[in-house]
């Protein structure tokens, strides 16, 4: 694969020039709710640019996995219809954090263009900002001035946000030749097909104030990004990014599965392109811990998958197919991203389940669309509200709604539809940035000399100083008795909630007062904030205090965290290597672990997992921790790491017997400290994600005692020895089964007895025999039984039965034979006709349906309505 070679050579080039190769962060930022997905190489370095985070290196290079399918950068609707738009792509980049600047960045870019990309220097062009004389002069060392163009802020000025770091940028373009257009310069190439941009160099040298003025940054940074797929296309000489390398391989696989051939210029070409791109986005998102859902990132992922299915239908796919393309992706990219190989079954399972659900939803949506068409017959227009519901709730594409509407000479109220869609997108955007705005402001404004130093791995108490006090979102100088607030300390033994471990509680005190810490969090890297209330006296900023963690609670939390690690390893050993942690929570009372697994765990496997964890507890292994360079452990098969997580260059390895994980949490000293481990329950939390809840120590002992007590009480109730309880229960169930059958037989005899009395009420219209009858109130729970018996006894082809409940409401049931359904008669349509005039409700399937109403017309009116409906349907 050319992409593998190009990626490797690019990273090696910069590594040989003192750049640290930094692994790609996940496709969604864990600690930045302001953006839906990682959409550029600089995202994972954002806090470095903002001086919120420090790292040991000043130069970095990456190949970053990116998704642009939501928020400000959203290419979803363009994918498949242009030559280069993608939702998933890789961005090659090099970064300088206060190290080199324009001169070196431009020199590197030129050298890479010639020696790594092997571009003809006579076909390279550059753009700079109209005010950036320095960059223009530097490019003149490599290019003639007539191939360097000055552009405005619109094209050559970059900013992270409305305020903050920003600067001029310089773009590199490659002339693909006259076959891609007649333009003679980038300025004439409005479509950008001949002179294709392949690299953007951003020079962060300013800080934009709230007033809009540009101030010089004390440290100047470089951020560059080059799209790997675009580079591969240029080097391969293909017309589009889809005709080379990985994407072409995925298109070929789709050709094999569909039996159709890919032709770029034909209408079906878009379907191939959409599927190839979307399979990559879905696969990497699932690997990094995302699953399709109804909100935020999960909702976007669901849209991507459903869009794939919609285009797949054009190629003839009528059942799940995306999972069959995944192995081709793994073959192409598994070497560069080994997490793909480890998660193949998980990716395929999530895709297949989601596709199955969507195909069912499409079927329901199609039926609903038919109802909408009937209910809208007076206006010949499908309302924007109905169209939006069909798309948003049932996933029916707008173009499919419009096509079906056209078949019936209907139109769609597109203005209202697009307005509702716009409002939905705006709500989604506000939800994404809401938590970001609410949590960052006050902490970003603090001027602290140093971040809080955590000493709590070994010390649960320390003498320290109060560095800041926050009350009601504002920094204050003191807190009085009974006032709630937040303390920030210079050193702290309190562990802040993160990595699934709950924060510590305890006390912060001095001779002047005591602050009860209820919980501890970390709003940004390096900062620990203590939430609580002054119980007596008062506390001031800069005051010397003693910080004391609640020791027993910490011990129980630490034991449970170690238990979580043991459980994770036991799951992997029992169920397989596909097990990956998808989330966790540990406090002083319980363990909750979410993990990837396609189905419920068998009881015998749960028992094996529990036994294995308890075996490691009895072996009483020392729990050991050590720090290591991430580069030394990142490829270790023994040490568990989570592909959705971002790691610093120095990591902490926690080893507990057979378990080895990268973890920053607190742990037991020995596995034996856990005492005993019990699983409470196992259940699904999302498609392909299971959850186990468990307890250790005292909580596990309490559970065991309760189980023992329950068994004794059950034995007493059953009047059976404990070792005979199961046999006794089985005998009771067998007896109940026999009694139920006897009751059912008697009920059927009663039903047939009643039917013998009313059999002469069966009526006929043409060749359709039908039966409509009012049953006594006592028979309301057996409407369906009566209808089925009528079909068997006469057999009658259409039945409608109704009765009155004790609350005065009417219940009506209709059943239609299979052969009538094939002729177009549907039970739910009949109930719609019978119940609409009286404001009733109904639901069901084509063969049988049930409804209710507060009132019904007289029997003869119902009979006439039914006759008219049958006659109309048979025309």
Curated annotation (Swiss-Prot):
HAMAP family: Ala_tRNA_synth_B
GO cellular component, as recorded: cytosol
Annotated protein name in UniProt: Alanine--tRNA ligase
Function of the molecule: Catalyzes the attachment of alanine to tRNA(Ala) in a two-step reaction: alanine is first activated by ATP to form Ala-AMP and then transferred to the acceptor end of tRNA(Ala). Also edits incorrectly charged Ser-tRNA(Ala) and Gly-tRNA(Ala) via its editing domain.
EC number of the protein: 6.1.1.7
Domain writeup: Consists of three domains; the N-terminal catalytic domain, the editing domain and the C-terminal C-Ala domain. The editing domain removes incorrectly charged amino acids, while the C-Ala domain, along with tRNA(Ala), serves as a bridge to cooperatively bring together the editing and aminoacylation centers thus stimulating deacylation of misacylated tRNAs.
Alphabetical list of Pfam families matching this protein: DHHA1, tRNA-synt_2c, tRNA_SAD
